[in-house]
Amino acid sequence: MFSKKPHGDVKKSTQKVLDTKKDALTRLKHLRIVIENADSIDLKQFFDQHFSHIYYVFFENFVTIEASLKQKGHKSQREELDAILFIFEKILQLLPERIHQRWQFHSIGLILKKLLHTGNSLKIRREGVRLFLLWLQALQDNCSKEQLWMFSCLIPGFSAPQSEYGPRTLDNLINPPLNLQETQVTIEEVTPLVPPQSGDKGQEDLTSYFLEALLKYIVIQVKSLEWKNKENQERGFSFLFSHFKKFYLPYIFPNLCKENSLYHPVLDIPQVRPKPHYVMVKKDAETNETIYCTKEPFIQARVIVIRWLVSFWLEPKPHSGPNIPGMEGEVLPKNIQRAAASLVSREESKNDTVDKADKTAEPEQSHSNTSTLTEREPSSSSLCSIDEEHLTDIEIVRRVFSSKRSNVNFVTEIFRQAFLLPICEAAAMRKVVKVYQEWIQQEGKPLFMQEPEETVITSSDIPCSENVTDHDISIEDGEKREEENGTNISEHVRNSTWTKNGSYQEAFHVSEEATEQNIQAGTQAVLQVFIINSSNIFLLEPANEIKNLLDEHTDMCKRILNIYRYMVVQVSMDKKTWEQMLLVLLRVTESVLKMSSQAFLQFQGKKNMTLAGRLAGPLFQTLIVAWIKANLNVYISRELWDDLLSVLSSLTYWEELATEWSLTMETLTKVLARNLYSLDLSDLPLDKLSEQKQKKHKGKGVGHEFQKVSVDKSFSRGWSRDQPGQAPMRQRSATTTGSPGTEKARSIVRQKTVDIDDSQILPRSTRVRHFSQSEDTGNEVFGALHEEQPLPRSSSTSDILEPFTVERAKVNKEDTSPKLPPLNSETGGSSANVPDLMDEFIAERLRSGNASTMTRRGSSPGSLEIPKDLPDILNKQNQMRPVDDPGVPSEWTSPASAGSSDLMSSDSHSDSFSAFQCEGRKFDNFGFGTDIGIPSSADVDSGSGHHQSTEEQEVASLTTLHLDSETSSLNQQAFSAEVATVTGSESASPVHSALGSRSQTPSPSTLNIDHMEQKDLQLDEKLHHSVLQTPDDLEISEFPSECCSVMAGGTLTGWHADVATVMWRRMLGILGDVNAIMDPEIHAQVFDYLCELWQNLAKIRDNLGISADNLTSPSPPVLIPPLRILTPWLFKATMLTDKYKQGKLHAYKLICNTMKRRQDVSPNRDFLTHFYNIMHCGLLHIDQDIVNTIIKHCSPQFFSLGLPGATMLIMDFIIAAGRVASSAFLNAPRVEAQVLLGSLVCFPNLYCELPALHPSTPDIAVSQFTDVKELIIKTVLSSARDEPSGPARCVALCSLGIWICEELVHESHHPQIKEALNVICVSLKFTNKTVAHVACNMLHMLVHYAPRLQTYQPDSPLKIIQILIATITHLLPSTEASSYEMDKRLVVSLLLCLLDWIMALPLKTLLQSVHSTGAENEKTEKSVLNCIYKVLHGCVYGAQSFSHPKYFPISLSDLASVDYDPFMHLESLREPEPLHSPDSERSSKLQPVTEVKTQMQQGLISIAARTVITHLVNHLGHYPMSGGPAMLTSQVCENHDNHYSESTELSPELFDSPNIQFFVLNNTTLVSCIQIRSEESVPGGGLAAGLVSANSNVRIIVRDLSGKYSWDSAILYGPPIVSGLPEPTSFILSMSYQEKPEEPPTSNECLEDITVKDGLSLQLRRFRETVPTWSTIREEEDVLDELLQYLGTTSPECLQRTGISLNVPAPQPVCISEKQENDVINAILKQYTEEKEFVEKHFNDLNMKASEQDEPTPQKPQSAFYYCRLLLSILGMNSWDKRRSFHLLKKNEKLLRELRNLDSRQCRETHKIAVFYVAEGQEDKYSILTNIGGSQAYEDFVAGLGWEVNLTNHCGFMGGLQKNKSTGLTTPYFATSTVEVIFHVSTRMPSESDDSLTKKLRHLGNDEVHIVWSEHTRDYRRGIIPTEFGDVLIVIYPMKNHMFSIQIMKKPEVPFFGPLFDGAIVNGKVLPIMVRSTAINASRALKSLIPLYQNLYEERARYLQTIVQHHLEPTTFEDFAAQVFSPAPYHHFPADADH
C-alpha cells in the first residue's frame, strides 16, 4: 500500500497527518513518511504531542484492513496488515509513558488479542507475541491480572494457570466463556485475522517455537521503548523476566535448587546419575547421524532457556564486525560485513557438528506470508548469535543478571542444570562450557567474578583474550602488539563490551557501592562452583552402547578436562579451590574408572567402546598433573595424599595408569636431577653435544617465525610441532631485559608478591588453542620448537614444560610439522634461561606420551630415548647439599628411611627395606618396570588424551613424596612417614631456590569448543607442561632460611630440592605396592619402567662429580641418587608366582644391574643377606629364563666389585653358567656365561678352600669347596669344545689360555693343562676361522711361557711346534683353493706363531728327530727343523709339493698320543656365520682394486713362508746378538767406512766408487760388495783376531725379505809375525828319516786304532771353546782332527750330517767290495815301500840338497775391488752355473731412492701403546697427565710390560719418542725377533710445562691402544683423554684381593681379540704379559680394519720385487766379468800410498 517514494517536506506530511479533513488512509500514508524520515528525537516529540491523532489514524486504518482481510485475505491485504502493524509498533515504542498510564488500555489489548488468536497463522501469532511483550514492557506493574494470565499462556504446551474461574487458557482469555443465562450485551467475539495458508510450513514443536520467540523478544526489544527515563528499559526487562521465572521456570526446570548460591556455595560432590533412556528420533539429513532424545518433559524447553542465557555471555566481537581477511582497517558496507559474518559462522558450524541443535531455531522467513516483517526483524537464525545492532540490549540484560545476588545465583543454577542434561543435549552443554571457559580465561571478568575489594579494570588498552578461532588477526599486527604489551598474538584484542564499554561502566559507577560490593563473589567461588557442577558430566552413567552418544560424552568430558587443565596450569587458585579440584578429580576418576574385574574383562580389547576406556589416559594425566601442580602452590594435606594413594592403588588394572605414572616419574626424575643434583638429563656432562650443536642451542631471541606459528595451536597439538633438531630455549622477557642483577632483584620482588593477582601487574602471555586429537596423535604432540626460537618466559610456575612436551613428542615422530607450540610470553621472569620445571615436567611427559599409535619403550634397558634438546633449565648447579652423617656420600637410603619408626632398615644407609605405607598398610616393595613397550594412553580417542596425559603425568609425578619432618629439611610440617620418608642423611638441606610467584600465566587458551570437531577434541597437553614448570625459581634463592617451600609449611611456591625430592618419592609409591597389581602385563610394564627409571638415576649418578673443563676433578658429590631404593619391590617381585614371569624377569634384571655397579655406600649386612638369598634361589631356579636373566645382567662385573661375601655365590654361578652353556637356545646369554666363568679361573689359586652356598639346595647352607678349579675348568673345557656360539667359544678359549698361564706361573702341574692345550691345538683347524684365530693367539701367548711349559712337561714345546707344522700341512691344500682371505690369514698367523715358537726354543731341541712313517715304508728319521723347512717349502711352492714323500713334513695322525688327540671332536657353531665375501675384508671399502687384492691374496701364504725361512736362516741360533734384542738388522750402509764416499747417506757418488758393486741374488736378495780398509790397532786384533791379514776387508751388505745384514770378511794369512829370525826350513825327508816311524799295522787294526783314537778325541775335546793351535795341542792329538771337531761344535750348520762330527770318518761306501778295498791298500803299501827305498839309497846325493829360501814379500794389489773379486770367485759367484741367479743392478738415482725407502722400513712388527695411571679421585685429563709416578703395584706392572730402555741411545723402534729427552729419559720396551712394542707411559714423560703436556697428550692420544691403570673408585671413561684415536681401551682396576679386574672398551667395528676379555679377572703374576699380549692383538685387530693394509713383510717383498723388476741389469758374461773386475774407473787416493 505504501510504496517508498522520495519524500517531500516532512513538515508538510506532518500537517497532513494532523489534518482531520483528510481521509484516514491519506493521513496514514503521510504518517508513514514522517516516521521513515524524521529524526528519532523529533519523532518522539511528534508522537508525544499528537498521540491522539496518531492513534486515531492507526485505529481507523486497522479496522479497515481487518474488514478487508476477512473479505478477501489476499497477499496485498496481508502486506497492508504488516504496514499498519509497523505503525502500531512505533506507537508502542514511542509512547511508553502514556501506555504505562493505561492509555488506550482496552483498545490495545483488543488488537493484541486479535493478533494472538490461536486461529491466526504462526507468523501473525509470533508478531502478536512480540507486540504484546512490548506493551507489557511499557505497562509493567500497571497491567491487570488478565495481561499476566495472557503472558503465562503465550507459550502453548504449559499447563494453564488456575484462577477462580478455572484454568486460564489463551483461548479463554481472548474470548472469555459467556454466562448466557442473563440477557446482557456481549462483546464481539475476537476472530483470527489471517488464518494459516495452505503453503505455510507448520511447526512440530510449538512450545519450543514460541518459547524461543518469547525469550528472544524479551531481550531484543529492551531498548526499543523510547523512555524518557532510561532506567525503565532495565525495569521493563526485569518485569518480564521475573514473570517468566514465575510462570514458566518451575515447569522447565522442575529440580531448580534455590539453595545453591555462588556466595555460599554447596561444594558437596554430586552422586553418580543413572543412564537415561535414550530414544532414536530421526537421522540427520546432512550427516546421516542418528539423533536421540530422552522424551523427558520440557527437555527441549530446558535446552532453549540454557542456550538463551548463554547467548548473553558469548556475545560477538563488537569492535569491527566480522574480520574479512585482507580488508583490515577498511570501512565495509554492512551487507558485505553480514555476508562475511555468515561465512564465518558457516565455517564454524562446519567445525561443530554437534551444534545441530541450533537448527531448531529455524529461519523465519519461511513462515511468513509477507516479506516486510522479516526485513525489519533482527536476524535470528541462531539464538546465540544476536546481531551486533543489538549489543546494547544484551548489555542491559547482562546488567540485570549482574545486578543482584539472586540473579547471579539464577545464572549459576541454570548453568548447573545444563550440566545435568542428558548427553543427547551435549550441544547446549558445550555452550555453557564455552562461557565458563571464557570467564576463566579472559582478563575482563564479569562483575560477580571480581574480588570483593577489587576495582574494575577499565583501561581499555589491556587486551582481553579471546579464543583464537574467533579471529583471524593479522600476524604482523599480532607481533607488534605482542611487543608492545607483552601479550601473545593469539590473544586477540577485543573490547569486552560488558566490562569495558563506556555506558556499561558508567552504569556501574552510578549503581550503589553496596550492591556492587554485594554481588562480587570472587574468582575462586566461581571456580569452585564450576569444578563441582561440571563434574556432573562425568558422573552421568555413559551410554556405551550408542556410539554417537559415547562420542558426545567423551567430547564433553574432554572439554571439561581441558578447562581443568587450563586452571591447573594458568589460573591462580587458593587452597580451597585446589583442594576442591583435587577432590573432584579423585572422585571423578574413581567413579568413571572403577569397575568390577568381570566388567573390566568384558571390555578388554574394546576399551575404545567405553567412556572409561576413552577417558582413562586423560583422567589419570589430569589428576596427576593437577596433584603435582597443587603441591607446588599450596599445602596439600596428608589425608588427600592418602586418598590419592588409595584411589590410584585400586585402579592399577588400567594400563593407562601405569603409562601415565611412568611418564610422570620420567619427568619427575628430570626435575629431581635439575633441582637436587643440578643436572640436565638431556644435556649431561658425559654426553655433551658437539660445539656446533651447542652453538645452535643459543637462541636468537623471540623470532618472527616463532610468533607466527604460535597463533593457533592447541594445547595438545601445539606441543606436537617440534621442529627437528632444535631445543626450546627460554628467552628473557621484555620486562626483564637488562642486567642479570636486576633480573634477580625483580625475581625476588615477584616471589614475594605471591598473593597479588598477577593479571594486574603483568601483561598476559600467549594462550594456545587446543585442537582435538586427530590421526597424528602421538607424534605430533609436541610442537616445533626451534633452538633458535626461544620460548617466551612466563613468570608462572607453569609454562616451562612446554618445551618438554615438545620434546617428548619428538621422540615419537621425526617428521614433525613445522609449527610452534604457543608458549607463554614472558611476563617478567628472572633468569630467563631457567625454565619452569613443572612445565618442563609436563611437557616432557607430554612429549613421550602422546600417541595412540605410539608404543613406548623398547624391551631393552638401553632403549630409553632421551630427548636431545630439553631446555637449558636443567643445567643449573645447586651446590648446597647436606653431608651424610658418617661422612660417606649417602645414597638416599630407602623409600622410607631411618626416620620412621616401623622401617626395616638397620642403619642410616639402609637399603630400602621400607615401604610406602598407606593407612597403616606397608607396601614392602616398590616395583619398577624395565623396558616393556607401554602404549601411552593409547586408546583415548581424542588426541588430546595423549598429550595431556603425558603432560600431566609429568606433572603429577612431580608431586608425590612426604618428607619425614624430623630428619628432613622440610621445616614446620611433618609429613607422614607412611607415604615415604627421607632421612636427614639423604635429603637435601633446604636449598633455597628463589621462588617464582605463582603468577597467572595464561596458557594456551583451550579450544574454541563450539567449533571443534568432537572426534578430534584433544585434551590440552600443555597442562602437563605447565604443571611441571617452575617459574624462574631455579636459582639458588637469596631468601633467608626461614622461607621454605609450601610443602614444608613455608610460602615459597614452585620447585625446590626438597619439593622435588618429596614429590619424586611420593609419586614413586603412588601406585601402592606394585607387586599387588593383578594384571601380569601391567605388572611387567611397571617393572619395565622401573628399569628405565633406574637407568636415569644411574645416569644421574654417573654424571655427578664430572669435571666440566677436564682440567680439575671435582670433589665427590655430597648427594647421590638412591640407586637401591627400588630393591624391596624387586625382592618381593622375585617371590611372585609364574603368572608374573615377565615382571619377575625385569625385577631380576634390575636387581643385577643395581648390584653390579660400584656401590657408593656399601650395602649393609641385612641387605646383602636378602640379596644373596634371592640370587641363590634365582641361580638354582628351574626356569631357565630366570637363570639366563641373572647371568646376562650380572656379567661381567659381578665378581670384580668385591661385594662382601660375593664369593659365596661362586658355585651357584659356575653351575648356572654351565646350564646356560649347555642349553640348546642360541639366544641364551652365552657370551655372558663364558665371561663369568672366565673371570673365575684365577680365583681357585687365591682361595684354596672356598666357603660357598651349596648349589644343589635352595637352602642357605655354606660348605667348604676344594674342587672349584676342577669344576670351572671342566665347564670351560666343555664350552671350548661344544659351545655353539662363536663369540662365546672365543671367550672360552681365552679363558683356557689365561688358566694355563695361571697354572704355569703357580707351578701347580695341574693334569688338565694337557687337555686344555689339546683343545686349543685342535681348535687351530676349526672351520670357523675367527675361533681358529683366537686359538692361534692363545698358542702365540704361550710362547712367553715356553720355559715354564718345558719344566711342566719337557716335550710340550716341541709337541706344539709339531702340531703347528701338522696343522699347516693339513690346512694348506684347502686354503690354497679357498677364495676367502680369512682362510689364508689363518695359515699366515699359524706360520708366524710357528716362527715365534721356533725362535723361543734352543737349537738342540729343534734338532731332535721326529719318527714318522714315510711313503716307502722304511723307517726314516728327520729332525723337527727338517720338518719345519719342508712345511715352509710347501707353503712357498704350493701344497702339491707335499705329494712327494721327500717333501712331506708330518701328518696330524703321526702326533696322536696319550696326551694329544689331534682328531678330538669339536661341535660346530650353530649361529649363522657372517657371509664371507670373496673380497678381502680389509679392502672391501675400496671397490676398484680387485686385481691388487687377488694378487695379495694369492701371495699371502707364500710371502709369509719365505719371510719365515729367511728369518730362520738369519736369526735362528743368533738372536739376540751382542747389540741386544733391540738390534735385529744392521744399521750399516754402503757409504759407511767407505773412503771413496764423503756423504753421510746413500748418494750418487757411490756409483763412481771403484770399491763397490751392487748385485741381485736369486731375484730375491740385494747384495752390495764393498772393499774397505782393515782396522788397525784394534784391541784383540779386530776382524782378523790378530792373525796376519790383508790390508783391506770385504763388506757384504745383504737386503732380503727379513731385513738387512752386513758381514765383514778378512783374508787370513797365518799367525802373527814373531820378531827375530825365521826358523830354518827342515826337509820332510830328513824329519821322517830321523823319526824312523814304526811299521804300520794292518789296515784293520789301523782303522780300529783311528776309531778308538777318534772316540777318545771326541770325549776329550767335544766342548773345546778355543781354536786348537800348536800351543794348545797335546802330542797325542791330531791338529786337523781337533780343528774339524771345533768347527762342528761351534758352527753346527757346517756339519755334513746332523749330529755327526766332521772328524768322524765317513761310513764305508756301499758300492766298494772287500777285494777292491784290499787292492787299494796293497797298492798304497807298495808305493810306500818303493819311496822309502829310494830315499835311503840317494839320501846323500848332491843333487838332493838345496839352499835355504826366504819368505817372499807380499805385493799390495792395485785394484780397489781386488778382495771382493777374490771372495766372489771363492764363493763361486763368477762361475757359469751361477750366471742365471747372480746379476748386476743398474746404478741410478732411482735405485738409491728405492734402497733408502727399503732401509727406512721396519723389519719387525711394531706397536706403540699408551699407558695411563689414574689415581683415586682423578677424573680429568690434567690431573691424569700430570701424574709423575704411581703406586707400587702400578710400577711393578709397568716393569713387567717390558724392560726399561734409555731413549737417548735406544736403537730399536722409538714409536715417535725423541732422543733429546723432551719425551722422557726411559720407557718400557719389549722385543722378540718378530715384534717390537714401545710403551708411551704417561708417568715417564715430562709434564712441567704446557708445551710438554701438549706433546705428551699428542704422543699418548695418537696411540690406538690405551692401557689405563685406574685406582679411582669410579670407572674410567673414554673421553677423559680427548683423542680421535684410542680405539681400544684396556682398563685395569686393582681389586682388594690382589687380583685385577679388566675392562675392555672398543669401538664396535673392532673384531674380537684376546687373551683378555671385558670382565676378565687375573692374578698380578700373569697380568703384565696378558695385558701386553692383549694390547698387541688389539693393535693387530685395528690394523686389520685398514683397507688394503699389508703386513711389513708383504710390503718389503713388494719393494724388493719392484727393485728387481726395474733395476736388474741383464748383461753378457763379458760385461758382467768386466764390471766385477772393475766396478768403476779407478782413481788413486793419496791415502792409499801409506796404507
Swiss-Prot record:
UniProt xrefs under InterPro entries: ARM-type_fold (IPR016024), Rap/Ran-GAP_sf (IPR035974), Rap/Ran_GAP_dom (IPR000331), RGPA/RALGAPB_N (IPR046859), Tuberin/Ral-act_asu (IPR027107)
Gene Ontology cellular component terms for the protein in this record: cytoplasm; nucleus
Ranges of Low complexity composition bias in the record: 894-911
Ranges for region Minimal domain that binds to TCF3/E12: 1326-2034
Compartments where located: Cytoplasm; Nucleus
Keywords from the named record: Coiled coil, Cytoplasm, GTPase activation, Nucleus, Phosphoprotein
BP terms from Gene Ontology: activation of GTPase activity; negative regulation of transcription by RNA polymerase II; regulation of small GTPase mediated signal transduction
Modified residue annotations for Phosphoserine: S710, S720, S772, S796, S859, S860, S863, S985, S989, S993, S999, S1003, S1477
UniProt KW Phosphoprotein keyword: yes
Disulfide bond residue pairs: none
Tissue-level expression: Highly expressed in brain, thymus and testis with lower levels in lung and spleen and barely detectable in heart or liver (at protein level).
Chain intervals with Basic and acidic residues compositional bias: 345-365, 807-817
Coiled coil residues, start to end: 1713-1746
Comp. bias regions, Polar residues: 366-384, 824-833, 849-862
Gene3D superfamilies: Rap/Ran-GAP
Function: Catalytic subunit of the heterodimeric RalGAP1 complex which acts as a GTPase activator for the Ras-like small GTPases RALA and RALB.
Protein name: Ral GTPase-activating protein subunit alpha-1
